[in-house]
Structures are given as structure tokens and as C-alpha cells.
UniProtKB/Swiss-Prot annotation:
Gene3D superfamilies: Classic Zinc Finger (3.30.160.60). A motif (YPX[LI] motif 2) lies at residues 646-649. This is pH-response transcription factor pacC/RIM101. Residues 7-42 have a biased composition (Low complexity). Transcription factor that mediates regulation of both acid- and alkaline-expressed genes in response to ambient pH. At alkaline ambient pH, activates transcription of alkaline-expressed genes (including pacC itself) and represses transcription of acid-expressed genes. It is found in: Cytoplasm; Nucleus. The lineage of its organism: Eukaryota, Fungi, Dikarya, Ascomycota, Pezizomycotina. Keywords: Activator, Cytoplasm, DNA-binding, Metal-binding, Nucleus, Repeat, Repressor, Transcription, Transcription regulation, Zinc, Zinc-finger. Residues 498-523, 595-619 have a biased composition (Basic and acidic residues). GO terms for cellular component: cytoplasm; nucleus. The gene is pacC.
Amino acid sequence: MSEPQDTTSPSTAAAPITASTSQEQSQTQSPPQVSATTTSSVTATAAAATAAVASPPVNGAARPTEELSCLWQGCSEKCPTPESLYEHVCERHVGRKSTNNLNLTCQWGSCRTTTVKRDHITSHIRVHVPLKLHKCDFCGKAFKRPQDLKKHVKTHADDSVLVRSPEPGSRNPDIMFGGNPAKGYATATHYFEPALNPVPSQGYAHGAPQYYQAHHPPQPANPSYGNVYYALNHGHEAGHASYESKKRGYDALNEFFGDLKRRQFDPNSYAAVGQRLLGLQSLSLPILSGGPLPEYQPMPAPVAVGGGGYSPGGHPPAPAYHLPPMSNVRTKNDLINIDQFLQQMQDTIYENDDNVAAAGVAQPGAHYVHGGMSYRTTHSPPSQLPPSHATATTSAGPMMANPATHSPTGTPALTPPSSAQSYTSGRSPISLPSTSRVSPPHHEGGSSMYPRLPSATMPDSMTAGYPTTSSAAPPSTLGGIFDHDDRRRYTGGTLQRARPEERHLPEPMDLSHDNKDDGERTPPAKPRQAPSSPGRISASLIDPALSGSANEAETMRTAQAATEVAERSDVQWVEKVRLIEYLRNYIASRLERGEYDGDSGMTRESRTPEAGPDGHMEGVETEPVSHPAKSESPVKPEAGGDTVMYPTLRGVDEDGDSKMPN
């Protein structure tokens, strides 16, 4: 039993021992260590650890016959080990401040690094000395300086868990030099103590680590391997972002309904409708899925839960989000009014300029007003302007007698001849029933916001205050007395610019021979046919723009570009139609399910003028019935009368008691 101790004691005393010799000694000592006593085992293990730290195979230690030379300037001393060489440089060449020989400039070879402290220069010397005392616990790589090891450990930040997570039935991968514990660090001095114990595999019956399996119980902590379950925090962030995006769409939809109620834009203007719907198409609306009302249902689970399944570092499930109710669609009347506005917008989209022109409703000979007066946002010319010649306003009668389809831009598809002023009218849609004035064409204050005014969709009762000669046309289509021939001047200029191009067509033809008799024109017919050649005909009569192949390619490209533009416009039109249908289905679903404020809705319905003949006015007066007996008197005669109007109600309120006995 004393032989192993005698063998190991010289190994600790002799410093220049190679790595292979120390490892062979540790291998030969391992069998007696198992059967030896505790004291002998600890002594042998400590000796093997000291030998491994003193001369590891990656440290670059010299062989017993080699020595390390000091390359400091003017020094030729040789040291047996890296430790002794490092101590030699620090004590002899660097010195100390207490001994008054401190040197802060490195003179190793051609290095002239200068520092400000002794600790800095001693740390710098480790770069030149082949001494690597700092080892990585993950891969076993050794480094000269601790800061180098710190930088190296950061590379294991992503894959450290995977490296330290053993597979079922395998040995501990943290043994750095093979499966034999005698090589490298000894098991007694290693950071992970149970090195030879196999990893229990009952916790890994499912194979690869699964992040969303909540049925597996948490495994006990084992120091031999790291935890393979990460804390999933990305789910909460993604869910929060999804909730924010849906809330933005929800608020935008509520604002859109509010604009409809306040008539902020004209539902009969195709340009205004398209521009307003464009803001909703770019957002994720919560109603596009076709489901029920979103504010009455909780958000889905991925929105609120921070991590799915079992995650030791995950957050507890948070309560589901609830969107607030829409403030602009609380009552039943709001839903009905908004549905009517959406129907107007739907009719506007279906009956825009392109569809009306395709149906043949537009006038083929009508030219349009100069672009400076119309403020149109679309590139297509309006097809509802009158012809250039002025006619009497009474001619609008037979034209408006037909149920002409109204144009989405605010004027009917077949407007009267004097309706050009509807493009520059400064009146808002709200002021149409109350005003009887047509703004002059030079007053264009509101034309940018309201480029087109509703005309064909207005009821006939709104034009009752106008003269009979113009009662067939709505107010926005009446011709004003402030014309000053502006319309005639603009349209005449357009025709004058187009006519010279038409006159160039008959110029190449020789019209001088057409006035002569057949006898004078017949004799020179043969001489003219003889010199005529295909080249001469192509040069004089054929348009050069139609002869080249390059022009044909340009024509094809132009046609293709026009086709693409038409396809894009069709796609935009389809998107607008679908969005309007979704909105109308949403309003209809709320009306069917009764998802509105019932108290205020019933109150508003009971206060409408239509509720008088039905007897619903009694329900409004149910509260004051029990207190005064006289409060019932004005209610009964009103319920019995069929011709009760608002002026009559005010009269009843004044002297209701006097009419009660009658």
C-alpha cells in the first residue's frame, strides 16, 4: 500500500514532468485508489490534480530535456516551467515599487507595450509566457488570461444548454478529455461531482425537448446537466403586438362610423368614399373574420398568455383582453342610420363613372370642364357634364323624369344642361335642405373637401321650395345666374385645340381632281398608275408610325400597361365592395342579435313622430302617471288623434287642461 504513495511523492516534487507521464501514472494509480483507504485515495487524487494543472497537454510545456528561454531584452536565462518563467519576468524585469525597480514597459522581444500599473504589465506578460491556467468548463480549452476566458465563455451563451444537456443513457459530456476520468481534471476536483453516474432517462421519454408539453412534471435539478427548457417570453410580446394592431383597427372603425354619423364626407362621392375606405383597408379590422361582435368576446389565448405550455421561467396566464364598446354605434338608431349610409356608399361604388360609361348611360358627345374647375382626384374624365351649348332649364324635365342612376361623384349620370355649377358649389351636404342659394363658380371654398354634391339620391320633397320651372332638378344641379360664360370659354378652348388635328387628316388627299369631269380625269390615269410603286405609296399615304416593328412593340407595351392599370383598378374596386359588404354584415349581425343599448334605443323610438299613432307615447309617460292624475290627460287625446304633428303637440302642452273635457 505504501508503493503507490512512494511513487507519487517524487512526481509531485519533480516539476518538469510531461503530460503523458503524469497521465500514465494516474492510470496506473487508479486500480489501487479504488481499494485503498480514504486517506491514500485523497492523497493520490490531489497529486494527480496537481500534476494535471502544472503541465496540461495544451499548455505547451517543454519536455524534460527542453527549457524555456527568457526573451527579455538583455536576458538569456532559461526556466524549466512556464510558472517559473512567469515569476522570473515579474520579479526580475518588472520589479516592484517597494524595491524601487518598477518597470512598466514590456521589453519581450520587439514588444514595447507601456502600462500605468503593475497589474496591467503582469497581465500583459501572460501573452508572451506559454502559461494557460484558465480553462473553460464547457469545452476544456485553456487560456492565458482571465479576460480571454471570459470572452470565450460568451460564445457558449447560446449553445451552453445544448452542450450540457446529455442524451438518454450517455455519460456526462462535461468530462473534458474523453470518458476516462483520470485524464484532465480528476473527478474529485471537478465542478460537476457525479461524473460517472448515467443521466436518468425517465424524464426524457418523449425524445427531443418539447417546449409546449404541459403534461410533463418539472424534473428535479441535476448539477450534471443544465436545464433544457427556455423561458418563452416571445409569446407575450407577439400577443401584445397583435392586440395593439387590432385595437388600432377597432378605433379606426369607430372613428369611421362617427364620421358617417356626422356626415364628415359625402357618401355619394366616389372619390371621397374611396379615399375614406383606403384608410380602413390598410388596418386589421376585427370584424373581417365574419365572427360576432369583438367587444363582447374575449381575445384568443395567444394574445394574453406569455408562454405556451410548461416553461419554468414563463409568466402566469394573464386575463383575456376586452375591447371597449364602440361609442358611435351604441343605439339601434345609430345602427340603422349607419346602415343607410353604407348602402349609399355601396350604391356609389357600384355606379361609378367607369361602370356607368360601360353600361352606355353616359352621353357620348359631352365633353368635360377644364380640370382646374373640377378638383377631381380620379384620372377618368367625368361623364355626367352637359354639352357645350346652353339650353333652357325646362329641358331638364324629361331628362330627370326617368329613374336615372345617380353618379358616385355626387351628380346624376344624366344631369341637366345647367348643372356644371355643381362642381364648384361651396355648399356642404348638411346645408342642402336649408339653403336655396347657388354659390357662384368663383367661390370654391368647400370644393376641395366636397368635390361632388349629392343630387340624384336626394328626395323630391327637398326641392319643394324651388320654382316649378326647376323643380325637376335637385338644388345642386341648378344653373346659377353667375355663369359669365366661364363654362363656354373653357369648353370652346378644348374644342379649338382638338379641331386642327382633325383637319390634318384630309390634307394628304388631292382634292383638286375631284372637281373635274370624268373626261379630264380619265386620260392621265395610266401615267399616274405607272410610276406609282409600293414604296411611293408607303412613303406618301401610309403613316410612318404604323410601319416600324419597334413601334409595334411600343404599342404592345402601351396596351399591356393599360391592361395592368385596368386590372389594378378592378382589384381596388373589388376590395372596396368587399369592405362595404363586411361592414353592412357587421351592422346587420348586431341588429339581429340585439347588441345595442336597449334603454336609449327604446326611448328614442318612442319619441319619434311615427310612435304617436301607434300609442307608444303612453309608455314614455309611465313614470309621471302614478304621481299626478292630470298628467294622463294630454296623453289620451294625442293617442286617439291620427293627425297629430309637432306643432299640435306644442299647442297641447300649453293648454292641455282646457282641451281635456272636449
